[in-house]
Amino acid sequence: MAFQEDGNHTAVTEFVLFGLTDDPVLRVILFIIFLCIYLVTVSGNLSTILLIRVSSQLHHPMYFFLSHLAFADIGYSSSVTPNMLVNFLVERHTISYIGCAIQLGSVVFFGSSECFILAAMAYDRFMAICNPLLYSTKMSTQVCVQLLLIAYIGGFLNTWSFTICFYSLVFCGPNGVNHFFCDFAPLIELSCSDVSVPATVPSFTAGSIIVVTVIVIAISYIYILITILKMHSTEGRQKAFSTCTSHLTAVTLFYGTITFIYVMPKSSFSTDQNKVVSVFYMVVIPMLNPLIYSLRNNEIKGALKRQIGRKIFS
């Protein structure tokens, strides 16, 4: 039942997700592609977490944050991908009102937490390259845990703002969401109540998180670049650059797509383009992050070889 009487109006009890396409053949193809991507995402990020946990040489702040980035990527992708896979297999995919709120909250929590974790990783690189003598003090276990708590608390607070605003919306119908998940923007368009406050508050909280974390990352890398340019050793410069390239690649991919969706004017791109970019940063990027960090990081590659060697010769 999609609607029920609620006082003087009819309230929506479920939403219909339009998904990515109506073409039945393309749906099957996309189902296979995204199932493979999701399996690689989960296995790759779980492998990263386990490798960091069992390898003593990776028990450093950078890899501590990387393991939680992998956890956030699993949660981020799992918030959307399984539901999207079901959407490919059924003719008319519905999601309950509560289910929509849970999915929205999960996406916001893991996405916001990832912003903070990426900022913490940039700060860690700043301390390692610009203040190496103070690194062990400034990036102690206690400090790392505090930064991680800030990341998850920030994610929770942003989720709370989105969830409260979602529940303040009144949906009278239609109930078709022109997306493959319960994104807040298309839900706002379906509301039959005043959306001035519910539309503003989440934009402010999410925008603040993006701006603050981008500033932290930008300032960190400005100081890192200045420090590297002052180095006289070519080998030292190359080593410093190599420790930052993986993180910079991940930051560029993540914030680049977020900027396209949430910062650029809506009139400059279509809903279908929005969907494609959303797929990239919610489904594809979580798969790419383990590859980015493992292929460009000698310590992770070395730890992986040692673990494989132990398994073979044990």
Curated annotation (Swiss-Prot):
It is found in: Cell membrane. Residues 1-28, 79-102, 158-199, 262-274 are extracellular. InterPro entries: GPCR_Rhodpsn (IPR000276), GPCR_Rhodpsn_7TM (IPR017452), Olfact_rcpt (IPR000725). Glycans are attached at residue 8. GO terms for molecular function: G protein-coupled receptor activity; olfactory receptor activity. It is a multi-pass membrane protein. Its main location: membrane. One of its GO terms (cellular component) is membrane. The chain crosses the membrane at residues 29-49, 58-78, 103-123, 137-157, 200-220, 241-261, 275-295. Residues 50-57, 124-136, 221-240, 296-314 are cytoplasmic. GO terms for biological process: G protein-coupled receptor signaling pathway; sensory perception of smell. Keywords: Cell membrane, Disulfide bond, G-protein coupled receptor, Glycoprotein, Membrane, Olfaction, Receptor, Sensory transduction, Transducer, Transmembrane, Transmembrane helix. It comes from the Eukaryota. PROSITE patterns: G_PROTEIN_RECEP_F1_1 (PS00237), G_PROTEIN_RECEP_F1_2 (PS50262). Disulfide bonds join 100-192. Potential odorant receptor. Belongs to the G-protein coupled receptor 1 family. This is Olfactory receptor 5P6. It comes from Mus musculus.
